[in-house]
C-alpha cells in the first residue's frame, strides 16, 4: 500500500550524490542531488517544470540562479528520454473544469482546512511514536505488514498498489459515502502500517489517494447544500491539498496538478485549497513529513545548511597542530626571534603542564 514515486526520487537523489562525489569540489553537492530528484519527478510524472520547482522548494530550500540551469537541464533531459521510450498521456486528463462562480471559493478554502487535518493525521502516523513490542524481531515486521495488506486486499483490492485507477474513477464520478470513507481510512492505516513495519516504499502516492478521498467525501456532503458544486474539482483540490502538506511543496504540487491534468483552471482552483491547507498544517504539525523524519534523527533542517554542515563536522577533522609554541620563561626578544625565524606573526604560550595560557602577536612585542 505504499508508493513508487518516493523511492524514485530517492534513487534520483542517490545518482546526483554519486556524481557530486565524482566531481568533488567542481560543483555544489546539493545542486547535483536536487538535479537527480528533479529528473525523477520529471520522468515519473511527466512534469519537467514541477520537477524544477520541487527541487528548489523541497531540497535546495531557496530559489537559486546558480542552481536553476543544472536542475532544469536534468529535468528536461529526463522528461525527453522518458517520453521517447514511454509515450503516455497526462495521468488525469479528464474534463474537470475550474471555478465557475465566486461562491465556490469558500468550499475550496474549507476543504483546504479539512485536508490539513487529514494530512496531519497521516503524517503523525508516519512519524509519531509507535510502540512496537521489542519481542518481535525486526525481520518479522515486514512479514506482518505484508500479511495485513494481503488480508485487506482480499476485500478491498483498491487499497493496494498506487491506486491510480481508483483515483481516476473517483475524480470522474462520485460513489457512496461509506465506500469512500472506508477507502480513506483503510489507505491511511495500511500505509502507516507498511512504512512503520519497514516495508520499503513512498508516501507520495498514498497521499494522492487519501487526498482524493478527502475531497470526494467533502464534495458529496457539500452537494447536499449546493447541488451545482463541481464535484471533480473538489476531489482534485483535496488531492493537491493533502499532498502539498505531506511533501512540504505547495508550489510544486500545484504545478504537478497542472501537468497531470493539463488544465490551468483546475490548478487555480486546487491552489486555493493548497494555500489554506499549508497555513493550518504548518501550525498543527510542521513543514512536512520529511522534515519531521529528519527531526526524529536530530537533524533540524531549519537551522540552515551551514549550521548543519558545522554540526556534522568533527573537531578532529579540522584540528591543526601547526602552531608556534612559546613558554612563559621566554623574554620578549626571544619570542620575536622565534616568531621571525618561523615566519609567523603569532604564537601560543603553553605552560610546562600543557595548559594554554594565552596568545601573543608579534606587533605587541615590538
Where are these regions (language model features)?
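A short, polar/charged loop-to-alpha-helix boundary motif
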Residues: 364-366
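Alpha-helical transmembrane segments and immediately membrane-proximal extracytoplasmic
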Residues: 1-312, 317, 321-357
Amino acid at each position: 500500500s505504499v508508493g513508487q514515486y518516493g523511492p524514485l526520487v530517492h534513487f534520483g537523489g542517490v545518482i546526483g550524490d554519486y556524481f557530486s562525489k565524482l566531481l568533488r569540489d567542481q560543483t555544489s553537492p546539493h545542486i547535483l542531488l536536487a538535479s537527480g530528484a528533479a529528473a525523477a519527478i520529471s520522468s515519473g510524472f511527466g512534469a519537467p517544470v514541477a520537477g524544477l520547482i520541487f527541487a528548489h522548494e523541497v531540497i535546495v530550500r531557496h530559489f537559486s540562479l546558480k542552481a536553476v540551469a543544472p536542475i532544469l537541464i536534468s529535468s528536461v533531459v529526463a522528461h525527453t528520454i522518458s517520453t521517447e521510450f514511454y509515450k503516455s498521456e497526462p495521468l488525469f486528463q479528464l474534463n474537470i473544469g475550474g471555478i465557475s462562480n465566486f461562491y465556490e471559493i469558500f468550499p475550496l478554502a474549507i476543504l483546504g482546512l479539512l485536508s490539513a487535518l487529514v494530512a496531519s493525521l497521516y503524517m503523525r502516523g508516519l512519524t509519531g511514536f509507535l510502540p512496537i513490542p521489542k519481542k518481535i524481531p525486526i525481520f518479522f515486521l515486514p512479514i506482518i505488514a505484508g500479511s495485513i495488506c494481503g488480508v485487506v486486499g482480499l476485500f478491498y483490492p483498491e487499497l493496494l498498489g498506487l491506486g491510480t485507477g481508483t483515483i481516476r474513477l473517483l475524480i470522474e464520478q462520485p460513489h457512496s459515502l461509506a465506500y469512500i470513507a472506508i477507502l480513506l481510512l483503510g489507505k491511511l492505516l495500511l500505509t502507516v502500517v507498511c512504512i512503520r513495519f519497514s516495508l520499503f516504499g513512498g508516501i507520495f502516492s498514498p497521499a494522492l489517494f487519501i487526498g482524493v478521498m478527502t475531497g470526494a467525501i467533502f464534495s458529496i456532503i457539500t452537494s447536499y447544500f449546493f447541488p451545482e458544486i463541481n464535484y471533480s474539482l473538489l476531489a482534485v483540490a483535496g488531492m493537491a491539498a493533502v499532498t502539498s502538506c505531506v511533501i512540504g511543496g505547495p508550489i510544486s504540487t500545484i504545478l504537478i496538478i497542472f501537468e497531470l491534468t493539463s488544465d490551468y483552471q483546475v490548478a487555480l482552483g486546487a491552489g486555493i485549497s493548497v494555500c489554506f491547507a499549508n497555513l493550518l498544517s504548518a501550525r498543527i504539525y510542521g513543514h512536512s513529513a520529511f522534515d519531521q523524519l529528519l527531526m526524529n534523527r536530530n537533524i533540524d533542517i531549519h537551522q540552515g545548511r551551514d549550521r548543519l554542515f558545522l554540526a556534522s563536522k568533527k573537531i578532529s577533522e579540522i584540528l591543526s597542530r601547526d602552531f608556534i609554541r612559546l613558554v612563559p620563561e621566554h623574554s620578549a626578544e626571544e619570542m620575536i626571534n622565534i616568531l621571525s625565524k618561523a615566519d609567523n606573526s603569532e604564537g601560543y604560550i603553553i605552560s610546562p603542564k600543557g595548559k594554554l595560557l594565552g596568545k601573543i602577536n608579534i606587533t605587541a612585542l615590538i
